[in-house]
Amino acid sequence: MPTIGFHAQHEQAHPRDLRDSAVHAEQAGFDAVMCSDHLAPWSRRQGHSGLTFAWLGAALQATERVPMGCFHAPGQRYHPVISAQAFATLAAMFPGRFPWVALGSGEALNEHVTGDPWPTKDVRMARLRECVDVMRALWRGEEVSHRGLVTVDRARVWSLPDEPPKLVAGAVSAETAAWAAEWADGLITVNQPPDLLRRVAGAYRDAGGRGELHLQVHLSWARDDDAALAAACETWRSNCLPTSLAWELETPEQFEAATRHVPPEE
């Protein structure tokens, strides 16, 4: 049986309201909750972007049973030692209820704030791979030093869970899915035409990928189709951009400019 979860979209709601939505999702019978991890929304109309670490602690405390996971991009805005410590703390405080983190190479929208250069995709993927090794070593209780695309000097995470979260790969393309198969504990991707989804999942499995497959499905709910379409156009035009462009834009204003003329049917 598939697990049907609720996506807590930080970019669209005040953190307090989003916490309450997670409670309502559990009460309504959803099997899980996941959330985004952005510093900025994709548009000013969306209007919010709470801190995932803080929100997850509050949401896990406010609910009773549903497991939760999140997207995350270590390596620039987040140092992997801080990522490892934060997720270890959540997993230790809520045993069995923080089972996975979905890792990606990030977007300039969130990462440019450090002032560091925004790397090319291949460098970001290599940096992510280093972060995976650093985080897992810390969760094994090791003291870690590392010199590469990220630097770590004698770090240790002292409060560890009995079971650390799985590191799931976020991938949109078949190429990235195949690359992630070597290290990932599972795969998460987003809704695309069925033939593309089969290619992504097949590439992951063919490359030896293990674990569960997760699919994030975007939908717009309203009392009639016209209202649902209007709501989607108002807040989610950014979904129409190719990922190769979306990764590079740095501000909500740039996303708005790039999608200003997207027609509703797209």
Model segments located where?
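Active-site-adjacent structural elements that line small-molecule/cofactor binding pockets in enzymes
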Residues: M1-E266
